[in-house]
Amino acid sequence: MDKKLLLIILDGVPYRNFRRLFGNLEGWVDSGDARVWKHRAALPSTSASCYATIHTGVTPQEHGCTGNGNVFRLKHKDVFAQTRASGGVTGAVAHSFWSEFFNRHPFDYVRDIEYDEPDSDTINHGRFHTMAGYGLINQMTPSDVDLFATLTNLCLRHGLNYGMLHTCTLDSMGHRFFHESQEMDHACHVMDEMLAPFIPQWLAAGYEIIVTADHGQDERGHHGGRGALQQETALYYFGPAEGPPADTVIDQVQLAPTILHRLGAQAANTMKAKSFLS
């Protein structure tokens, strides 16, 4: 496999806050270096359920993850597995749920916090965190610049074809402060500023890039149900592919087949949605 793509998931950012507060991403849209669409989360619009949908291309009603309290090793084929089957190298820097869904369950703190498994059928290079002890006051999230740097390190050291990064910072802060607040305005600005220097590095290394969220949040910092604030987020794409008209709404089940299409890998038979990129 000679194609490369990175998926960056900023957990819990509603569409309006992406478009209003991420000045670097929006600047690249204005310059023509990126394109942006609205992205609609599955139902329930709960984090774990959305993680599973993003990578399997099927709804929670099919893959079976009904919420954060129901995490298990998924049976459906996923982006990691399909990339590996086509000869690609995979990596993930993310919450431990991702390792449990797509590699091993339950998560072993010592064995699974960091691994390099060249023969794995799913995730070759994993760097995970659990957020154990998470609460309203202490959100237990790593520094995002450290996560971006870790993904870059994996790309350079191991030649990833597909890498994904997931950070819970903005979701956790949104639950505490709600998204219509000075604290969240600043947090989104800081996230945008920390992410921005890595975008040119990844592009220079030959990666296409998708930046999005798993779901949004409403005025009270809630998500899990139906509605524009809970379900709708933005999706930014950096790369040469042609995409749909700007007013198109991307369904979450389209992400997995789109990523695999851009990598030149075969989508699983269970991934029925069409790629939104040519």
Segments and roles (model prediction):
Residues M1-S278:
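Feature captures the catalytic ectodomains and active-site-proximal regions of enzymes
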